[in-house]
Amino acid sequence: MELGNVTRVKEFIFLGLTQSQDQSLVLFLFLCLVYMTTLLGNLLIMVTVTCESRLHTPMYFLLRNLAILDICFSSTTAPKVLLDLLSKKKTISYTSCMTQIFLFHLLGGADIFSLSVMAFDCYMAISKPLHYVTIMSRGQCTALISASWMGGFVHSIVQISLLLPLPFCGPNVLDTFYCDVPQVLKLTCTDTFALEFLMISNNGLVTTLWFIFLLVSYTVILMTLRSQAGGGRRKAISTCTSHITVVTLHFVPCIYVYARPFTALPTEKAISVTFTVISPLLNPLIYTLRNQEMKSAMRRLKRRLVPSERE
């Protein structure tokens, strides 16, 4: 088929999470609560780290960046999902779909690289405590965060540059609630076997290997902590377990979605909801509920902002 004779699809239709109006209302209320809590939780982390001088350390500087990413990442999909749950016709233009894919992979890639930077920070703090302040200076942290965003940008450019030349001339129905490579790729009017293999290698294989690398890194860190003594050991172990939990919650759904052939499975929508909406909510909960220093800083900030709390 010659691409010049192909009529390009101008919009895609989502089947969404459910076809039932009652279920749509329940899901809307639930996901709206989750999204608002995600925004407030991550915003609270950003404000606390910014306003509390005791938290002006590399670890919290990186945590604030992760909170920014979580707000942006969830906002890429959640508002559209909420709108569609209240709409009979769930459509998205071709341009908006490609834009959503670009932002989704930019922020998702930056998130993965940022989690790697946080693992590096944790390793430096434990293995080289005397040189930690020098190695993880404010300038170095800024450079690492910038590199994380740039890595996400490059990853996203690769994804979108592979998709844009493809012809979309026939079916335009997506059995999902957001635009992503696996779903959109199945609607093209050409053979995508080689491209699918390339994207599985680029997304799935790299993500799996990166996840294994991070787990090995944290295992080394925990083994290093076993030989140390002192009051900081428990705090370091708590920090590491929080990191491991967040890494697992982020990577496992990614591996499920991208490290297999792009065929629809019954559990795909549930995993996608966890990946796109639930995970950004859990990150602030994990980092704050297990972190006494963060909770103390939030209480101090509350006393400063609410006059009655000072009494």
Swiss-Prot record:
GO MF annotation list: G protein-coupled receptor activity; olfactory receptor activity
One Pfam family it belongs to: 7tm_4
Heme in keyword set: no
Signal peptide per UniProt: none
Localization of this protein: Cell membrane
This protein's encoding gene: OR4D11
Name of the protein: Olfactory receptor 4D11
Extracellular side of membrane: 1-25, 80-100, 159-195, 259-269
Taxonomic classification: Eukaryota, Metazoa, Chordata, Craniata, Vertebrata
Keywords associated with the record: Cell membrane, Disulfide bond, G-protein coupled receptor, Glycoprotein, Membrane, Olfaction, Receptor, Sensory transduction, Transducer, Transmembrane, Transmembrane helix
Organism whose genome encodes this protein: Homo sapiens
